[in-house]
Amino acid sequence: MASSSASDCDAHPVERESMRKVSQDGVRQDMSKSGPRLPGESAITDKEVIYICPFSGPVKGRLYITNYRLYLRSLETDLAPILDVPLGVISRIEKMGGVTSRGENSYGLDITCKDLRNLRFALKQEGHSRRDIFDVLTRHAFPLAYNLPLFAFVNEEKFKVDGWAIYNPVEEYRRQGLPDRHWRISFVNQRYELCDTYPALLVVPYRASDDDLRRVATFRSRNRIPVLSWIHPENRAAIMRCSQPLVGVGGKRSRDDERYLDIIRETNKQTSKLTIYDARPGVNAVANKATGGGYEGEDAYPHAELSFLDIHNIHVMRESLRRVRDIVYPHVEEAHWLSSLESTHWLEHIKLLLTGAIRVADKVASGLSSVLVHCSDGWDRTAQLTTLAMLMLDGFYRSIEGFEILVQKEWISFGHKFSSRIGHGDKNHADADRSPIFLQFIDCVWQMTKQFPTAFEFNECFLVAILDHLYSCRFGTFLLNCEAARERQRLAERTVSVWSLINSNKDEFTNPFYARESNRVIYPVTSVRHLELWVNYYIRWNPRIRQQPHPMEQRYNELLALRDDYIKKLEELQLATPTKLTDSSTPPSGSAQIAPRMQTHF
C-alpha cells in the first residue's frame, strides 16, 4: 500500500508531535479520524473515494481536504493514513472520464504533483461528487487565482527557535573578515532602487563609489552588478556574481563596467587576470546578443579570462526532470533502466554543475585569481555555481546552520525566482518559467554527501525536508521571487520559517558521522560513473525500490533511543524517591554512576 511517508526522511513525525502538544494544551482536539491538523489548518470537506494506488490497486477510503492538505484514510483497515499531501505540492488537477464512462474506476480525478507523484481518485458519477471535490481542490491548491492566501499566511505554528533570525548579512560578511581595506559594505540598494532583485546590503570593492555602481548597473542585465559572494580567508581571492553584460549585436561597450572589473581584479595582487565563468554554452551566449545580452569579449576586457561552462537553460532542465518522472513513477522498468536513465540526461546536467563549481572553487583556493560568475540574469545557474563552490571551500556551510545561511544568502536574498520556478499557488502548470533549478542544487549537495559522508553535519532527511517544504507552502521561506517583495509582504512577521521546524528538531536532521573540519576543501568526483540517481528522493514513493537505511546509522539511532529510554527511567526513579535521593549523604551507587554515562556520545 502506498504510504504517506515513503522513506524515513519525512517531516510528518515532527508534525504529529506538534499537533499532539496542541491537543494537550486544549487548543485543538485530536483529529485522528478526519486527519491531522496544524494550528491554523481548517477542514473544508470530505468525500468517499477509491484511490487507484499504482502499487497495490484500488483502495476504498475517505478523502479529507483542508486549507493545507488532502488526507486519505482507508475504510477497509485501521492502519496509518494512506496519503497525506500538502496542497502546495499539486501542480495540475484534471478530470478523468465522462458521463458515458463505463469502465471500473474510470471516472474521477487525476492529480499531478511537483514531487513526482501522480494521484488518481475514482468517484461516483451521481450527485456532482467529482465537481464538488474538483472545485474545492482547485481553489485551495491554487489560491492565488481566487484571491485566497497561501497556507503560510494562516499557519499558526509556534516553535522554540525563530528560523528567520538565522541569517544576518552583516554578521555573515563579518565572519568572512569583511569589510576590509579592499572591500566595503554598500547600502546603495537599501530601498531596492539600484536593483529590485538584489538584497539591500551589498559587498563591493572599496575603490568603487555608489555612483560608479549606478553607472555599472545600466550595463548589466536587470541591473545585477558584480558583487562579492565569498572571500578566501587566507589568499583573499573572491567569488563574485552578476548577470550578463548588455553587449548586443552591435558590440556595445561600457567604460564604467570595464573599469569596475579592473578594480575587482586589482583587489587580488597575486594575479594579472580576472577569471570570468559564464555558465552558459558558448553558442547560447552568442545568441543572447540578439536580445541585447552577451558576454565579456577580449577586446573590451583584456585583463579578463572568459570560460563557458556549457550548463543548459531552465527549459532544458525542466524537460530533463519530466523524463526522470516518466522512468521512475509509477513503475521502474528494470530491463532498460540504465539506458532510460541516460536518456533523461539528468546526471549529465548534475555532472556539469559540479564540474563548473569545482573550477570556480579550485581557481579561488589556489589563489590564482578572483572569479566572476554569471549566466543570463544571474539568479539560476549563477546561484547553483556560487553555492556549490562555497560548500566545497568553506566547512562552515557544511554545518546545519551554515547551510541555512548559504541558502538564505545566495538563493533567497539574491533573488532566485522561487515563486516563478516552483509556481506556488499558481494553476498555470505549463508556465515556461517553471524549472527544477533549486532541486538540482540540492541533488548536487546530496551527491557530495555520498562522496564525503563525514563532511556534512546534516543528513539526507534534512535535504528531503527542504525539498518537501519548497513546495508545501506551509512556511514563508521560499515564497515570492526577491527580497524586496518579501519585505513588502512582511514575510518574516506574517509567516513561519522552515528553519524554525528544522532547528527545533535538529536530532532528526543530524548526520551521526559528522566530523567538523572547517578548513578542509572537498572536490567530488564528477564522472557519471560516480554519480547516482537519488533513489530516496526520486523513487521514494515506490515501496518496492526504496533503499534501506545505512546499517551503522540505523544502529546509531537505536543506541540513541536506548539512551533516551534509560534517561526517562532514571528521571522516573528520581521522581518516585525524592526524599531518599535528597536526604542520603551518600547517593546510591547506581544513580551516581548512571547519570554521567547518559551524556556519553554513542
Swiss-Prot record:
Where is the segment annotated Disordered?
Answer: 1-40, 578-602
May I have one GO cellular component term? late endosome
Q: Which residues bind a 1,2-diacyl-sn-glycero-3-phospho-(1D-myo-inositol-3,5-bisphosphate)?
A: N288, N313, I314, S376, D377, G378, W379, D380, R381, K417, R421
Compositionally biased intervals (Basic and acidic residues):
9-31
Query: Where does this protein have compositionally biased stretches of type Polar residues?
Result: 578-592
The enzyme's E.C. designation? 3.1.3.95
Instruction: Report domain GRAM positions.
Output: 28-97
Q: Which residues carry this modification: Phosphothreonine?
A: T495
Gene Ontology terms describing biological process: autophagosome assembly; endosome to lysosome transport; intermediate filament organization; mitochondrion distribution; mitochondrion organization; muscle cell cellular homeostasis; negative regulation of autophagosome assembly; negative regulation of phosphatidylinositol 3-kinase/protein kinase B signal transduction
**What membrane topology is given?**
Peripheral membrane protein
Where do the Myotubularin phosphatase domain residues begin and end? 163-538
Q: Name one Pfam family in it.
A: GRAM
EC class: hydrolase
Checking InterPro entries in the record gives: GRAM, Myotubularin, Myotubularin-like_Pase_dom, PH-like_dom_sf, Prot-tyrosine_phosphatase-like, Tyr_Pase_AS, Tyr_Pase_cat
SUPFAM superfamilies tied to this protein: (Phosphotyrosine protein) phosphatases II (SSF52799), PH domain-like (SSF50729)
What does the record give as the active site? C375 (phosphocysteine intermediate)
Query: Does the record's keyword annotation contain ATP-binding?
Result: no
Localization per record: Cytoplasm; Cell membrane; Cell projection, Filopodium; Cell projection, Ruffle
Q: Which domain of life is it from?
A: Eukaryota
Q: How does the record describe its quaternary structure? A: Heterodimer with MTMR12. Interacts with KMT2A/MLL1 (via SET domain). Interacts with DES in skeletal muscle but not in cardiac muscle. Interacts with SPEG.
Q: What does this protein do?
A: Lipid phosphatase which dephosphorylates phosphatidylinositol 3-monophosphate (PI3P) and phosphatidylinositol 3,5-bisphosphate (PI(3,5)P2). Has also been shown to dephosphorylate phosphotyrosine- and phosphoserine-containing peptides. Negatively regulates EGFR degradation through regulation of EGFR trafficking from the late endosome to the lysosome. Plays a role in vacuolar formation and morphology. Regulates desmin intermediate filament assembly and architecture. Plays a role in mitochondrial morphology and positioning. Required for skeletal muscle maintenance but not for myogenesis.
Family in the record? Belongs to the protein-tyrosine phosphatase family. Non-receptor class myotubularin subfamily.
Show the domain comment. Answer: The GRAM domain mediates binding to PI(3,5)P2 and, with lower affinity, to other phosphoinositides.
Question: What protein name does the entry list?
Answer: Myotubularin
Gene symbol here is Mtm1
